Regions:
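Extracellular/periplasmic metallocenter environments
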Residues: 22-26, 35-40, 88-121
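N-terminal edge beta-strand
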Residues: 30-60
Length: 121
């Protein structure tokens, strides 16, 4: 008789602790929609210019660049960094980030400007 009482008690205890487990919904998964950043480069003027942009860890970025001549965005990550070339006119540049929390500069060298500072949280 004790065995028949012990089994339901153990099962009930397991279910109780399983229900009390942490919810992982606050953990970044990289499934967030890409952050769209519009960049305009016209007559030597760049907008945005040094603006801070917050990202979730694992969130990708999509740059929509409207430029009066071809050029490159330089992304300074912990590794070797990345170069994203753009054409004259409107270009869409996709940036996949797999970085730890911190800050990443995105700049152009013609003109020499920090376009955005990505803050990964």
């Amino acid at each position: 008789m004790r065995r028949s009482i012990a089994i339901p008690a153990v099962l009930a205890t397991c279910l109780f602790f399983a229900a009390c487990g942490e919810d992982d919904s606050d953990t970044p998964t990289g499934d967030a929609d890409p952050k769209v950043i519009e960049v305009t480069i016209q007559d030597g003027t760049v907008t945005p210019n040094g603006e801070r942009v917050r990202l979730e860890q694992g969130q990708d970025v999509e740059f929509l660049v409207d430029a009066d001549k071809p050029g490159e965005l330089h992304v300074h990550t912990d590794g070797e960094g990345q170069t994203l070339p753009y054409n004259q006119g409107v270009s869409t540049l996709d940036l996949a980030l797999d970085e730890a929390p911190g800050q990443i500069e995105v700049e152009t060298h013609d003109p020499d400007v920090v376009v955005v500072l990505l803050e990964i949280r």
